[in-house]
């Protein structure tokens, strides 16, 4: 299924001169995550720094993290192809919703993304707790 990235995301990618995107299934949610190549490289560098190459569990976690990655290129119209196996992983059957998440873009099945991700009172409580915590610098 070929999808067109939202105009705002397309402009950001063009401004950043990103050649390709990296797609993987989110670790915790049933959505897909698109990383600009530079953001993916940053995350990979951070993960590598934390890994103990001599720890078999670390190796397995690393292998799992990178094993199901797809390199995505945008065509001249800003469209890209989502492989069928990714559509299945994210339960995407038809319409999608793009959600900007800092330096990545999540792709959700529209019917899943249109529902609240958490109850409003839980969201308020969690946001208050996060924003009330001093930033460590």
Where are these regions (language model features)?
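Short, Lys/Arg-rich amphipathic alpha-helical interaction segments
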Residues: 110-137
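Polyanion-binding surface elements
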Residues: 75-76
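Short, small-residue-biased leader/transition segments that mark boundaries at the very start
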Residues: 1-4
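Short, well-structured hydrophobic secondary-structure segments
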Residues: 16-18, 24-43
